[in-house]
Amino acid sequence: STKNGRDSNSKRLGVKVYGNQPAKAGSIIVRQRGLTFKPGKGVSVGKDYTIFATQNGIVQFESDKKEKIISVY
């Protein structure tokens, strides 16, 4: 028998709502490990670094020199 053959379940991370798409309050925009995307206006961060909308609006991805910021307007 082999000692290999194990793998963890995928965690389904990544962007769930893309730029210029509508988001309702409470809807998840990004699932991430660590703050790859930083929160802007109209969004908040959960304890597992999930970024979610706090208001209804359109998702906008903005980038400074280093930071990627997500906002909902």
UniProtKB/Swiss-Prot annotation:
This protein's record includes keyword Chloroplast: yes
Stored SUPFAM superfamilies: Ribosomal L27 protein-like (SSF110324)
Any one biological process term the GO annotation gives: translation
Cellular compartment(s): Plastid, Chloroplast
One Gene Ontology MF term: structural constituent of ribosome
PROSITE patterns: RIBOSOMAL_L27
Keywords carried by this UniProt record: Chloroplast, Plastid, Ribonucleoprotein, Ribosomal protein
GO terms for cellular component: chloroplast; ribonucleoprotein complex; ribosome
PANTHER family linked to this entry: LARGE RIBOSOMAL SUBUNIT PROTEIN BL27M, RIBOSOMAL PROTEIN L27
Sequence similarity: Belongs to the bacterial ribosomal protein bL27 family.
Name of the protein in question: Large ribosomal subunit protein bL27c
Organism: Chrysochromulina alifera
Gene: rpl27
